[in-house]
Amino acid sequence: MGNCLKVGILGAGNIAGSMAEALNELQKEGKACAYAVASRSQEKALEFARKWNITRAYSSYEELASDPEVDLIYIAT
């Protein structure tokens, strides 16, 4: 991930998927990357993280917001 802006995504639905796709493109340029995702369902968060190659998956929004590695949070709920 290097020096990219690490983005946390709140939510794991269609809008969140669009953002993850855009972040994967930005990661190629070293600008930003999808680093974490949070969903009320741990299973859904893990599935989303696997699909979009995201490092961390949380089952609560508070956990993601508390992660010191997250630079920016995108709210997709």
Language-model features: where?
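N-terminal Rossmann-like dinucleotide-binding module
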Residues: M1-W52
